[in-house]
Amino acid sequence: MIQIPFNFEPYMNRPNNHLYAISVFLFLLPSIVMVLTHAAWFLGIEIGAWIFIISLILSAGIIFLLEKQPIRANITGLFVGLILTWGSIYVSGQFYDCSFDGQWYHQDAIILISEGWNPIWDNPIPDADASGLNANYVNHYPKASWAIQALLFRLTGNIESGKSIQYLYWLSLIFLLTHFLRARLSFSWIKTILLVLFVSLSTVSLGQVHSFYVDGLLYSLFGIFLVFLIDFVYFKKPTGWLLIFAFLVLVNVKFTGLVYGGVLMLGATLWVFAQQKSLLKRSIARFALAVVIGVGIIGYPTYVRNTLSKGHPLFPIMGKKNEGKMIAEVQYPLDFFKKNRVQKFVAAHRSIPIYTDHDHASVRKPLFNARLIQDSIPYFKNHQPVTMSPFGPFEGELWVLFIPIFLLFVVRKQPLELYVLLGVLIGSLWIQPEFWNLRYAPQLLLLLAIFVATSMNHKSVWVGRYALFFSFLFVINSVLAVSQNWRWVFENNRELRKQLEPMRNSCVKVQAGWMKSFELKLKTNHITPIYTLDTNAVYEPFLGDAFSGWKYMKEKK
């Protein structure tokens, strides 16, 4: 028998306070940046490095005041948090966003804000100043992520560093969930690690970590807000102010964040009213304050201005002349137009992972076909999450393996609080008509995690082992999907950098495309674009760039 020459047990059983400190620091730093940026907008003050410095000091100070934790745990948490923050900014800055929306209106908004546009007091951006001659999304979409990213752009001089908030909130969720499972639910380390991997290796989060898309942010913030909420109303922990901060960011990252956050708070209010009346006044006060600040103040440039100018807070996805239906149907396969929401969900999650569009229908997947699974893996070499089998190449098989876990949950009486939690999560899914699309309802993974976690703690050892085995397979499935996406990102970046490098410190004749953000790539590489077109020249697209439409003049040999 192999003997391990070192005993890790004392280290594994140490208090988990430092995990909480790390999580809170990583969560607070970008969140305070967002709040201070909005404060600067209201006051008409130019945003700059001072916001980041103040946010850093406040975040460090707050983690020492939250709970009666050992000073050493807070110092450790702060030190690790600083390293992870620097690492996130550095890594994000090394990769260009290759996605469609990320290079389009997301970077448009970040550039405009960094150049001084104040979305509270300034006039809306005219269509002529936006990529694709469409400023609707820049003017009317929630602006929390753009506020933080514009500040990071000003701080580093590299717009790509703004993507680091994907890592920061994702890592915050990982440490927060690890602490929650260990400190609140007394999960063993093996159960904790597998369940945290199950939740965190989301194809939404990791599939968008190299882009400015906000669906992954929505998922991380949803999870963070949910944990703070459970801590507050069930475990009676002093997380009221943290959940307010989480709500502020959640509802201003994406419109659906407001809807999902509202559903979670409604469920929490009903629980407190029925089971924790001593918390009722405090809970309602915290929730009301969160809504007023989140929608009326931080959300002023979005929800209030949309209502005043367009008659609906959620314009352009709702209200007069809205684009909601069109946006939702962009990713519809041919066979989805006549299906209801449940039929679309079933079709999407049992389909072969294949390319679909308005001319190509989903195809029901033959299960447990090893060759088919292997052949479908390259499909995930794309922006995540994909629409068909979004969890990975053998998602269909995992749904079959999930059936025993679901049935064991149903036949066994569960605690009331578990039914309430499931009901709230299901409600947050059902309220989204397009919950078949994992991008729009990423919390589906959290719902599955609750069933798995319950089975892990089943009184039968074999049921617990089966849940661990299922979690392991799910993690492998996620890794296969995400690794393909990362490969796609790395290859595109390699090709683009390979082409831009020889052009550094030179003037290059270019044909401008429709995405304005590509010009920034040229300028950050010290390339001076010359827009005088040569009708006799041959212009070729930049390698690794599939969307912007920019071309350069190829030198004649």
Residue spans for each PLM region:
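Transmembrane-helix motifs of polytopic, lipid-linked glycan transferases
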Residues: S31-V35, S59-E67, L151, S161-L185, ...
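Active-site lumenal/periplasmic loops and adjacent helix-entry segments of GT-C-fold
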Residues: S88-T178, S211
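Signature aromatic-anchored transmembrane alpha helix within multi-pass, membrane-resident enzymes
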Residues: M12, T76-T85, K236-F247, T256, ...
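Lumenal/periplasmic acceptor-binding loop at the mouth of the active site in multi-pass
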Residues: S114, N118, D122-P124, A144-R154, ...
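Membrane-embedded, hydrophobic transmembrane alpha-helices
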Residues: M1-A73
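Hydrophobic/aromatic-rich transmembrane helices and adjacent perimembrane loops
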Residues: I53-I54, I111, V214-F222, L250-V253, ...
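Membrane-interface transmembrane helices that cradle and orient dolichyl/undecaprenyl
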Residues: L185, F225-G240
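Membrane-embedded, lumen/periplasm-facing catalytic core of multi-pass transferases
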Residues: F469-I530
